Amino acid sequence: MFMSSSSSSHARRPQLSSFSYLHPPLPFPGLSFFNTRDKRVNFDSTRIICIAKSKPARTTPEYSDVLQTGLPLIVEDDIQEQEEPLEVSLENQIRQGVDIVKSMLGSMEDGETSISAYDTAWVALVENIHHPGSPQFPSSLQWIANNQLPDGSWGDPDVFLAHDRLINTLACVIALKKWNIHPHKCKRGLSFVKENISKLEKENEEHMLIGFEIAFPSLLEMAKKLGIEIPDDSPALQDIYTKRDLKLTRIPKDIMHNVPTTLLYSLEGLPSLDWEKLVKLQCTDGSFLFSPSSTACALMHTKDGNCFSYINNLVHKFNGGVPTVYPVDLFEHIWCVDRLQRLGISRFFHPEIKECLGYVHRYWTKDGICWARNSRVQDIDDTAMGFRLLRLHGYEVSPDVFKQFRKGDEFVCFMGQSNQAITGIYNLYRASQMMFPEETILEEAKKFSVNFLREKRAASELLDKWIITKDLPNEVGFALDVPWYACLPRVETRLYIEQYGGQDDVWIGKTLYRMPYVNNNVYLELAKLDYNNCQSLHRIEWDNIQKWYEGYNLGGFGVNKRSLLRTYFLATSNIFEPERSVERLTWAKTAILVQAIASYFENSREERIEFANEFQKFPNTRGYINGRRLDVKQATKGLIEMVFATLNQFSLDALVVHGEDITHHLYQSWEKWVLTWQEGGDRREGEAELLVQTINLMAGHTHSQEEELYERLFKLTNTVCHQLGHYHHLNKDKQPQQVEDNGGYNNSNPESISKLQIESDMRELVQLVLNSSDGMDSNIKQTFLAVTKSFYYTAFTHPGTVNYHIAKVLFERVV
């Protein structure tokens, strides 16, 4: 996004001790360890957190050739047990982390953000209105005096960016010099500037601060007026002056004085301004586009009372220092939700997330939003992220908000910008994938953003001008290679945990700044604990499902171990929560039974009919096969016994968990699939419906199948999954290719036409699922989407990539 910030904590807000720049402690104090070989699942009556204390931590072999060869066959003999200590109470550690995050989310106000020495220096330069010759805000000068770094500079102590250190330091030197205080600090700061100014030549241009080419020359001129001599003959400075002159020629002075633009954010660097006109463009809080330095400059020239109130409030709020932008409330609310979701821990915070998005929706406008509420200027980054999250959570938002950002065939983050931001276009791409039917603007946004990001990736130019983050190239690469239709929650989480930098991620504004409620180690450590806990349970389930497989000799019915693993992976990657184990195993076992039946009777219509007849003979009660002798050949008998024994177990599980007898519903669902399959021998016909119906039944969701919406969902899901199944079957022996997620299909190619139809149906399905006004339980509808996305993933994801995901998701612990 455009500007984001990082944080100073208020006294009544949660103390984020882990945000210490120099010595971050463990996020959850009191970790202790011991050896155990115990297996248990603990349940809490109010919030179920299942803690799988499994066998000692086990490691899998490194599958270095996983992308070139077939799926690694991971069996018990491949797994070496290691005596690795486990936390005494993982449940307590997770609960403690959840409580900390809940406290953070519950304390959100205008945004937590770090202090900017540059902006604080501008505030310190303001002369007292009633006592000329003295500072209006002496506490800002004191903040500067207290926060000089050991090398004589000011700026972020953990990240050395020459642009950041130089502009912060020069501004602070000017402020101290103006009021003739702390000459020793001035001298040390000036020495730092002179010794390091040449480093600008080697800096990455993508990481140049916002408006640096305007603000820094302005500071140099101020320094000269105060008698501060700085050599200006370096090639780096000459380049900056050239960029400044070019940018100033492009600034439409007539427009900027009459219409709110992003130039209001950098007024302190612009010459010859008509302040009488500009004051009319103030934000409602008295600021100029929420910039303390820009507003401080305006206060110097206008003595405006609203400017004074804005600055005065910030100085008191942050104890003398001020941020580089404030407030950042919408940015913080949106990005927090995004991080929690991608880290896989959002399920712990449903009420808080609902509150966050409700807040964002209250300030949503027909033109979008920016980083703060009540802004007359919007940006594509915050608008895209907000649009995506609001639509995902059932809010009605129009894609027309993106029209103002379209410029010809391109989309821009702001009108008048000089270069694109990777993350802005990346978030536009993510938003465009929430497309409903006939949303042309999103089609255009998707096509542009995909092409832009692919070109940047091919040129190894995935550096962003708004954030320095741990692994943006792989984050963007994953989104391009695995579009949202194919993106499985656990796969995204497993990879994002490695890409998320926690408190080390730093944002780029006029200075570097941090957003501790967006980027922190509390989220990261909680995500790691929760992921490994879930994975431990998944590993136990994997062991057990292999025993189920062996017990029924499913290998003899055409289901190999690799298929079993892929099927369990698909179920787990969608339904990963410990408390949803029954649904997860039901998904996996149902899919495996379907495969076994379809594979074994693939070439014999007579045997399919025989199987269907025998299936229907069983009474519609519990205990289908108890004591009954099957007068059919052994294979059919074995499969029928297997199916009904498994259905019996499903029914018992549902009865125990939900207190409902779903036996009849299960039988009806299976009978419908069996009869459909026996006609044409195509297992894909109706398979998705069987999975959806069974999963929802096991989750305690019952719904009238006669309802029009329910029938429409089933029809769409069956249609799309059947098409995807056939597409996968037809292309499984060809060289796989990633899905072209840009809408640019070749209409003369039958496969492209099939893809176009799939995309069209997917948009309609997404619209039905995300529409919250139809009265249907969202959890029921989400099952339709989850099953369909698993088919999409299978059809369009390279087998080598699938193998890699399986190894990461199920067998590689997060460290």
Curated annotation (Swiss-Prot):
Keyword Transit peptide carried by entry: yes
Activity control summary: Inhibited by high concentrations of magnesium.
Entry's Gene Ontology BP terms: gibberellin biosynthetic process
Keyword check for Isomerase: yes
Enzyme Commission no: 5.5.1.28
Reactions that this protein is recorded to catalyse: (2E,6E,10E)-geranylgeranyl diphosphate = (-)-kolavenyl diphosphate
Record Pfam families: Terpene_synth, Terpene_synth_C
Gene Ontology CC annotation, any one: chloroplast
Domain of life, per lineage: Eukaryota
Record keywords: Chloroplast, Isomerase, Magnesium, Metal-binding, Plastid, Transit peptide
GO MF term set: isomerase activity; magnesium ion binding; terpene synthase activity
Subcellular location field: Plastid, Chloroplast
PANTHER family hit by this protein: ENT-COPALYL DIPHOSPHATE SYNTHASE, CHLOROPLASTIC
Family: Belongs to the terpene synthase family. Tpsc subfamily.
Functional description taken from the UniProt entry: Diterpene synthase that catalyzes the formation of (-)-kolavenyl diphosphate from geranylgeranyl diphosphate (GGPP).
Name this protein carries in UniProt: (-)-kolavenyl diphosphate synthase TPS14, chloroplastic
Species: Tripterygium wilfordii (Thunder God vine)
